Regions:
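An anion/pyrophosphate-binding glycine-rich loop and adjacent beta-alpha core
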Residues: 347-349, 356-489
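Glycine-rich loop(s) and the adjacent beta-strand/alpha-helix scaffold that form part
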Residues: 302-373, 572-581
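A glycine-rich dinucleotide-binding beta-alpha-beta segment and adjacent secondary-structure elements
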Residues: 42, 284-286, 483-560
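Active-site- and interface-proximal helix/loop "cap" or "latch" segments in soluble metabolic
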Residues: 2-108
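N-terminal Rossmann-like FAD-binding beta1-loop-alpha1 element of flavoenzymes
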Residues: 120-150, 587
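Core beta-strand elements of the Rossmann-like FAD/NAD(P) dinucleotide-binding domain
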Residues: 120-123, 301-311, 542-543
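Conserved redox-cofactor binding core of oxidoreductases
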Residues: 211-303, 322-324, 370, 502-507
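Glycine-rich FAD pyrophosphate-binding loop
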Residues: 143-163
Length: 592
């Protein structure tokens, strides 16, 4: 029973992916049917200076809402790549229905799935995943004469490549020219430093290949497609100060999404057979007599596609969306800013083929520390939310890791945002009673504004935080604050032993514990590859028609159980460069 919602337009709100405002929708009913869903606020801004409307949210507006209206059901699947926004929209719809005479449970009408099987034959290359590495593979193979079919599980292409600032490139020609013709680094010195940082655990021939080829990728994308790179290069955390990465976008003020979409549109013109589909998730590799001959995938509507190709490029972005794999290889299930449709398909399939892992346990890509549960509710002020965030980032207080050990978030000078992963999935800031009272009476020791997920609150240093009790109550409501009477009490509430005898000298009195977390983009380890980007098997041989690119093979550039290299943009640079090289080699072997 759906109940009966009177004709009219109703508005509703719910927290979504953004950190500034809740999603707000206007939903129109006629004859107890949803006839329109309009966006009032997309709720997508992940930073105080971002637009609330994002390209990820656009996939919800363009795909989810029409499907709900067509099916008159809330059982429509969430949009892959926009799950949080999809679920927020469904929450709003349920609340609107229930608040206006309807019964949202009655709207859970099963949506029939297709049983069709589509076979696509005679492709030279099938690309699984159309983030940076997959798009680069597609472009490179297509421009060199291959017929190419690509598939992307999400509803849009570009993946994390549309969310990151930019890639690493060693001495790219245009930027060197803008630098007066002077190289930014000596390649041999960079190679030596790279291998020293990785304690010789990275694969030397791949590191050298990346150093030699990454700069060329900038020119390739800028000269042939709608990508634009700043003329300046930048340094990152590395102590040498080498300028090895830059920011990129679409040309003529376009976005990264514009650049990826335009590039793929151009690649489709290279021959009439080239094609790609979004919302198409690979489920297995097709094999005949032990040889890989293509990919089987399922579309959002249930249609099964069997794509037969001479070679396959596995470009599906690592395994950050696979809890079992992240627990096995990195020790935790992580909070993410990156795309969680990256579920380890490529790596799992490589292992079934007898592929060799290479540093699958490289640390996750972490540049963000924040509250465990970022407070997205409009019921609280951004000032209060920002004050609590400042405290969870404050190195002046005692911190412990996920095992209850004392944790120094800046032990190496790189800062908490870079080091938070070393605490495990969570870290905790412990404030003793004296410190707490000082904040109320004298203000914060320091006001910490995060690089990401900043909510734009205002605070004047030295101002007493007289409403600190209210801020702590807000944190408690979202599971971010635990108030304990003692270390023993805190240990019981957290469910772990705490290896401290005091909190900054306090042995008695309340402890105010704020729960923080690393927010990560992706995993950084995976399979072994050779210099042709081919999968290396356990016996040391290579599989010449299986290419493994991007995060799926990023472990070859990094060290086991260590943060990935400190030069900036390494993951993005590898994605674009490994894809370019894979497409080029695939064309040499399989075109025509």
């Amino acid at each position: 029973d759906k109940g009966n919602v009177p004709d009219g337009t109703y508005t509703g709100k719910a927290p979504s992916f953004g950190v500034m405002k809740e999603m707000e929708l206007a939903v129109t009913f006629k004859d107890n049917a949803i006839v329109s869903i309009e966006t009032v606020c997309a709720g997508s801004a992940t930073q105080y200076n971002e637009d609330e409307y994002s390209n990820i949210y656009a996939t919800v507006e363009e795909k989810l809402y029409p499907r709900i209206i067509e099916a008159q059901s809330l059982d429509v699947d969430a949009i892959c790549g926009a799950t949080v926004s999809s679920n927020a929209a469904k929450t709003i719809l349920r609340n609107v229905i229930d608040a206006n005479g309807g019964n949202s449970a009655g709207w859970n009408i099963p949506v029939e799935k297709s049983t069709e099987v589509v076979e696509l034959r005679d492709y030279d290359v099938a690309v699984v995943g159309l983030g940076s590495s997959g798009v680069a593979s597609f472009l490179s193979a297509a421009e060199n004469g291959c017929t190419v079919f690509g598939m992307e599980a999400a509803a849009k292409i570009g993946g994390n490549g549309t969310n990151t600032a930019g890639p690493l490139g060693v001495n790219p020609a245009a930027q060197v020219e803008a630098n007066g013709g002077e190289n930014f680094v000596d390649p041999d010195e960079l190679y030596t430093a790279w291998m020293e940082y990785c304690e010789d655990d990275a694969k030397g021939e791949i590191v050298k290949l990346f150093i030699d080829e990454s700069g060329k990728t900038f020119g390739w994308l800028a000269d042939n497609y709608d990508f634009a790179f700043l003329p300046s290069m930048f340094s990152f955390y590395d102590s040498h100060g080498w300028k090895l990465w830059t920011m990129y976008s679409g040309k003529d003020g376009g976005s990264k999404d514009d650049a990826y979409n335009a590039a793929m549109a151009k690649a489709l013109t290279y021959n009439e057979k080239n094609d790609y589909k979004t919302e198409l998730r690979a489920t297995s590799l097709l094999k005949e007599d032990g040889k890989v001959v293509g990919v089987e995938a399922v579309a959002y509507d249930g249609t099964v596609y069997r794509v037969y190709a001479d070679c396959v490029v596995l470009a599906d972005g690592g395994y950050i969306g696979n809890a079992e794999m992240t627990t096995k290889y990195t020790g935790s299930v992580w909070h993410t800013k990156g795309m969680t449709q990256c579920d380890g398909f490529g790596i799992s399939q490589c292992l079934e083929l007898g592929g060799a892992l290479y540093n699958p346990d490289v640390a996750v890509e972490d540049h963000i520390a924040a509250l465990d549960n970022i407070i997205r509710s409009d019921d609280y002020s951004n000032d209060d939310k920002s004050l609590l965030t400042s405290l969870v980032l404050d190195l002046n207080y005692q911190m412990i890791d996920s095992k209850g050990q004392s944790f120094d978030g800046n032990y190496n000078g790189l800062g908490l945002a870079f080091n938070a992963w070393e605490a495990g999935a969570n870290y905790y800031v412990l404030i003793n009673q004296e410190e707490y009272d000082s904040i109320k009476e004298n203000g914060l020791i320091s006001y910490n504004v995060p690089m990401f997920f900043g909510q734009g609150g205002a605070y004047t240093e030295g101002t007493p935080v007289s409403n600190l009790d209210d801020i702590m109550e807000m944190g408690k409501a979202f599971g971010d604050v635990i108030v304990a009477d003692s270390l023993e009490d805190l240990s019981q509430q957290l469910g772990m032993d705490i290896a401290l005898s005091d909190v900054h000298g306090q042995t008695e009195g309340k402890i105010y514990c704020i729960k923080g977390a690393a927010y990560v983009y992706s995993t950084c380890g995976g399979m072994d590859v050779d210099t042709n980007m081919n999968l290396v098997l356990e016996d040391g041989s290579s599989m010449e028609n299986v290419f493994v690119v991007g995060n799926n093979s990023l472990g070859t550039l990094n060290a086991s159980n260590k943060a990935y290299v400190l030069y900036g943009g390494a993951a993005q640079g590898w994605a674009l460069t490994s894809g370019r090289l894979a497409g080029q080699i695939a064309a040499e072997r399989f075109a025509g």
